[in-house]
């Protein structure tokens, strides 16, 4: 699954996009062959690996590199010291780490539920449209590897390894801190030995070391937190943003933008989709297996209707996919909470709490994708309903290809 999904990404990036660029007269290789795999956060990792960190007192107005955690750019820098170019090093680390994460995840799920759910879990991880971030110059691969390894080690009562992997996860991303309450609550509830508590406190190791670095270099141990203000001025649940996204699906982006129903046909179309779905449910016994084809057709139709972004908000594209991935995954995690390891379930809920309280709706879908227990839950669902799994993965493959096209052109994705 890893190889096939990566081949799709490579084909779109290096075969399809050059043709699109030539016919559309756009530039996709300003810096080199790897530019299609380099966008947004990638630029910050390049700056850190080549020039180091920076920080200033005007952090509420100016973006500083210290907001990005060090393990990924540090790993790239180490490879650069032996002659490996930045792009090659960054891509090797992320892709190989993502592959290793899939292998670890497969073994963990297989030991709990058998081969079929393990296969579906890795399929969900590899074919989710946001698995694109496991192929480009981003931190997804490393974070997946360390967080999954930490959860699996703790679940298997390998507390030394749990502490080591969890410390590396917080050195990669601040969201790894969700492992701390997950380990502590699990240790308390399951009455685990003192070693489990030591593993819990080791989670903070990556953040503590980075804080010491910030204190020594910039005189501010929390510089990485303060620097976040340039990207977001508030925190908390972005209710207005999520409501706007929901309204994009229900009444259409054009009507949301103007603040009233200007395009009457979109709400009528949405109502027809809802009524059709109700009819499919009502006559499900008569329709039999044909019902699922009807639902899939309605899903594709609603996606085509709603995928337009707000003209005033470039971060508002694909609202239907984002809402289903984020809140659908949260509901599924709750429903599957007794079927996945307790420590994984607790970690998942704390990770959602962090992701949904950033004060923004942008990038939340990518943060949710990086919550390993979410894929665990999707794997269990698809193993139970494989025909739905095949349909969902086919759709995900299409979206993955479309996301590659957007990323290659430096359009906002997540």
Regions found by a protein language model. Name each.
Residues 113-115, 150-161, 187-191, 339-340:
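Membrane-interface transmembrane helices that cradle and orient dolichyl/undecaprenyl
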Residues 88-89, 105-127, 144, 342-346:
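Transmembrane-helix signature of polytopic, membrane-embedded enzymes
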């Amino acid at each position: 699954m890893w190889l096939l999904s990566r081949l799709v990404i490579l084909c779109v990036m290096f075969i399809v996009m050059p043709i699109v660029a030539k016919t559309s007269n756009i530039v996709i290789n300003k810096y080199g062959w790897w530019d299609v795999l380099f966008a947004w956060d990638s630029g910050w990792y390049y700056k850190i690996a080549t020039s180091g960190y920076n920080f200033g007192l005007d952090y509420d107005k100016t973006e500083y590199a210290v907001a990005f955690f060090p393990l990924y750019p540090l790993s790239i820098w180490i490879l650069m010291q032996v002659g490996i170019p930045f792009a090659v090093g960054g891509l090797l680390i992320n892709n190989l780490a993502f592959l290793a994460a899939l292998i670890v995840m497969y073994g963990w799920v297989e030991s709990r539920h058998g081969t079929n759910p393990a296969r579906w879990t890795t399929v969900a991880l590899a074919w989710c449209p946001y698995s694109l971030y496991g192929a480009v110059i981003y931190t997804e691969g490393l974070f997946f590897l360390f967080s999954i390894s930490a959860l699996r080690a703790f679940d298997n009562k390998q507390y030394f390894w749990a502490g080591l992997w969890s410390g590396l996860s917080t050195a990669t991303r601040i969201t790894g801190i969700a492992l701390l309450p997950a380990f502590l609550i699990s240790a308390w509830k399951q009455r685990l030995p003192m070693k489990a508590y030591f593993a819990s406190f080791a989670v903070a190791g990556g953040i503590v070391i980075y804080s010491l670095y910030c204190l020594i270099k910039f005189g501010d141990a929390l510089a990485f937190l303060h620097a976040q203000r340039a990207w977001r001025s508030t925190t908390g649940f972005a209710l207005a943003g999520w409501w706007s996204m929901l309204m994009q699906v229900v009444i259409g982006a054009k009507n949301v933008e103007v603040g009233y129903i200007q395009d009457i046909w979109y709400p009528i179309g949405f109502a027809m989709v809802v009524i059709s779905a109700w009819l499919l449910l009502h006559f499900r016994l008569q329709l039999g297996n044909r019902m699922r084809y009807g639902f899939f057709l309605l899903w594709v139709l609603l996606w085509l209707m709603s995928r337009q972004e707000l003209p005033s908000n470039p971060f508002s594209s694909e609202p239907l996919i984002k809402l289903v991935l984020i809140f659908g995954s949260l509901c599924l995690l709750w429903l599957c909470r007794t079927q996945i390891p307790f420590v994984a379930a607790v970690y998942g809920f704390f990770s959602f709490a962090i992701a949904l309280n950033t004060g923004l709706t942008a990038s939340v879908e990518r943060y949710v994708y990086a919550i390993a227990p979410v894929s665990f839950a999707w794997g269990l669902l698809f193993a139970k309903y494989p025909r739905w799994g095949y349909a969902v993965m086919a759709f995900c493959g299409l979206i993955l290809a479309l996301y590659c096209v957007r990323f290659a052109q430096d359009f906002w994705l997540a």
